[in-house]
Amino acid sequence: CDPTFILDCAPCNVICSIIFQNRFDYTDQDFLTLLEKFHENLNILSSPWIQVCNNFPALIDYSPGIHNKLLKNIAYLKSYVLKKVKEHQESLDINNPRDFIDCFLIKMEQEKHNQQSEYTIENLIATVSDMFSAGTETTSTTMRYGLLLLLKHPEVTAKVQEEIDRVIGRHRSACMQDRSHMPYTDAVVHEIQRYIDLVPTNLPHAVTCDIKFRNYLIPKGTTILTSLTSVLYDCKAFPNPEVFDPGHFLDESGNFKKSDYFMPFSTGKRICVGEGLARMELFLFLTTILQKFNLKSVVDPKDIDTTPVANGFASVPPFYQICFIPL
């Protein structure tokens, strides 16, 4: 099967459970429409045209179709979130918050006399929209790319499954406490993120004040694009960086080895706020899949191409077929 749909649904429902309290059925039309909008936006943002427009914004006026589609999808998401917020306002119990929206609304009520408060309906909608946009496609794309790499490298998959059998077994679910006892699996998750280099140029940021850096004056308001590729593929930190090798995160004794050059979530004050959740999802999704299934490719592993089909905002893996064989 093509794993795209199921790998889209799982992380999106995790976000839904945090924001809305409830999970969606995978046939729910609202849920499917949300997934469609997220998928379209990732493909648009990863297209060469968008990268050209980033450098020459005036071109948007001459060919606005894709740009308008992106904005229309964002507007749909915000209108959907607003509808959910209004439903929460009608049923809010300040003594019994159910989810993120409730907690935000309670904080709004507590600060309603503070004119400088950041807790506003507009910021709530923006925050929830950001959580969806940043927390759904990124995790699902990483998982989709990760399974492709495991198909390409069955020897790596076998080692992960051996560690799962030894630490977790077959009769209980994986939990985050297991990760510290599974250095090889932890290394594989890290190497997947390093190797795929999901967001090569990071998210654009703006300088908040004039700053001098290495004899360059960077004026306030300047847009900054940082190259995460330069650290994730640094040959001093990761020998043979073009090779998928979990050993990049293992020491000579087979223990997990941290690296200061591992920053797929960026770094500093503006690091991805969803890093903790994404790390948990990737570990738990991967171990659960490999605990329950063997992976089989429909082609010879040597013939699997892992080159991204789009490499603009995000590195998007090629579509592929995979067989999940129950253990």
Curated annotation (Swiss-Prot):
PROSITE patterns, sorted: CYTOCHROME_P450
Gene3D superfamilies, per the entry: Cytochrome P450
GO CC term (a single one): intracellular membrane-bounded organelle
Keywords: Endoplasmic reticulum, Heme, Iron, Membrane, Metal-binding, Microsome, Monooxygenase, Oxidoreductase
InterPro entries: Cyt_P450 (IPR001128), Cyt_P450_CS (IPR017972), Cyt_P450_E_grp-I (IPR002401), Cyt_P450_sf (IPR036396), Cytochrome_P450_fam2 (IPR050182)
Inducing or repressing factors: P450 can be induced to high levels in liver and other tissues by various foreign compounds, including drugs, pesticides, and carcinogens.
Positions bound to heme: C272
Catalytic activity: an organic molecule + reduced [NADPH--hemoprotein reductase] + O2 = an alcohol + oxidized [NADPH--hemoprotein reductase] + H2O + H(+)
Main EC class the enzyme belongs to: oxidoreductase
GO biological process: organic acid metabolic process; xenobiotic metabolic process
Subcellular localization: Endoplasmic reticulum membrane; Microsome membrane
Family assignment from sequence similarity: Belongs to the cytochrome P450 family.
Annotated function: Cytochromes P450 are a group of heme-thiolate monooxygenases. In liver microsomes, this enzyme is involved in an NADPH-dependent electron transport pathway. It oxidizes a variety of structurally unrelated compounds, including steroids, fatty acids, and xenobiotics.
Identification of the protein by name: Cytochrome P450 2C42
Gene: CYP2C42
